[in-house]
């Protein structure tokens, strides 16, 4: 057993991967044969990921606020606290906060054999993001 006492350092989401203010608290990192990676990710209103994929899929669990998510070619869905979204391995997608709401989710992935959790693509354009359904605020 290992207890890690309140020592999480918040990191700013890199501009190459995110649009807007995003803050990441690592919860679990791969170690000792485990390939599990989990983070609590905090999005300011309008902030979002770039298009990306995960080699072994990704689960996000919304814990606060209102968010949006979309797989390439699909509709933009509104997600709320308690919602869980699973993105299939290799499925191109994005997720983030609604325009007028903060959103926090726990992101869980299994890294690949080289330790990579994701492959990042282009930023979600303002036009793509603006196609989201209205969210009451």
Tell me what each language-model feature is.
Residues 1-36, 117-137:
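A short, N-terminal "cap"/entry segment at the start of jelly-roll beta-barrel domains
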Residues 23, 37-54, 89:
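Conserved short histidine dyad/triad with adjacent acidic residue
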Residues 29, 53, 61, 81, ...:
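Conserved strand-loop elements at the edges of beta-sheets that form or border functional pockets
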Residues 40-44, 53-69, 108-111:
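Short, conserved beta-strand element in jelly-roll/cupin
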Residues 49-51, 69-70, 87, 92-99:
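Short beta-strand His + acidic residue motifs that chelate non-heme Fe in jelly-roll/DSBH
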Residues 59, 86, 100-119:
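A short hydrophobic beta-strand segment most commonly corresponding to one strand
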Residues 73-90:
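Short acidic-glycine-tyrosine-enriched beta hairpin
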